[in-house]
Amino acid sequence: MMANHLVKPDNRNCKRPRELESPVPDSPQLSSLGKSDSSFSEISGLFYKDEALEKDLNDVSKEINLMLSTYAKLLSERAAVDASYIDEIDELFKEANAIENFLIQKREFLRQRFTVIANTLHR
């Protein structure tokens, strides 16, 4: 192992003092050996959390998809009801138009009839 050499900090171009910088270990292998047990448990815990989070996200995604499909079905049913109402209204307008035409013809027929009666009475 190499001994750590004390280096006098050069503050001319530095924005922060050297004490705040993290020390660089002499050997990355030695520094990671002490951490291996704790980092392994942290990593396995993270994997467990990631798996649990992914499961929760999948469950939420399924619920959202179910709600969206239910909403789409509801909108489709309402659109079908609206279309049937439009068809009924169209039929009512056709029937009203037929009745109006019948009444116009009836009025014209009665007018002609009254004209004939009036002409007969005036003679």
From Swiss-Prot:
InterPro entries per record: TEX12
Annotated Gene Ontology cellular component terms: central element; chromosome
A Pfam family matched in the record: TEX12
Transmembrane as UniProt keyword: no
Region of interest (Disordered), ranges: 1-39
Subcellular localization, as worded in the UniProt entry: Chromosome
Compositional bias ranges of the Low complexity kind: 27-39
Tissue: Testis specific.
Compositionally biased spans, kind Basic and acidic residues: 7-21
Gene Ontology biological-process entries: meiotic DNA repair synthesis; synaptonemal complex assembly
Secretion signal span: none
Oxidoreductase recorded as keyword: no
Keywords, sorted A to Z: Chromosome, Meiosis
PANTHER family: TESTIS-EXPRESSED PROTEIN 12 (PTHR37349:SF1)
Binding partners and assembly: Interacts with SYCE2.
Free-text function comment from the UniProt entry: Component of the transverse central element of synaptonemal complexes (SCS), formed between homologous chromosomes during meiotic prophase. Requires SYCP1 in order to be incorporated into the central element.
Full protein name: Testis-expressed protein 12
Organism: Homo sapiens (Human)
Biological classification of the source: Eukaryota, Metazoa, Chordata, Craniata, Vertebrata
This protein's encoding gene: TEX12
